[in-house]
Amino acid sequence: MSKQKKFILQENEIPTQWYNIQADMVNKPLPLLNPKTKQPVTVEDLAQIFNFECSKQELDTQHAWIDIPEPVREMYTYYRATPLVRAYALEKALDTPAHIYFKNESVNPLGSHKINSALAQCYYCKQEGTTNVTTETGAGQWGAALSYAAKVFGLEAAVYQVKISMQQKPYRSSIMRTFGATVEGSPSMSTRAGKDIITRDPHLSLIHI
């Protein structure tokens, strides 16, 4: 038998808390600034576009450990723990004594780590009484993750995807729609910002999707 390459936790070993590194940093990052007031962003500022609990966690610099809600952790068990893989071939190619590992996130339903955050965000939105979520996405991974999470927690989802990316990766938007999301190429005429952009540069509305 060759050396062990994959290391996988059992379901009952999946962490029960998220780690907030800011709490342990001696030199903490500069605060986010409100673009209107130029003052440090408050939880109330962020809560205008994100749910309150995630806004609070985003600005928390005191608590190192945050409990993972049990419904979120339960959803994690469907695809976590993802394998931790020892990259022996890369170590050999680099001729290094260091041990190199990578996390294989391709085994989860959406193929990226973004579902981990999307599930938590949609859970908190549901708990706070939100009925629908709206997001942007570039290549489509985040849009797919949020669409899936919204479906899990009974929310409606609207996704605005960069129009050229939507054209180049048509199956990503198909995945989002499979989970019940509405998907629109951006810029579009359905938003004020999109109308302004297309008015200034009309050819942007001609990209086929």
Regions found by a protein language model. Name each.
Residues 1-207:
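PLP-dependent amino-acid enzyme catalytic core
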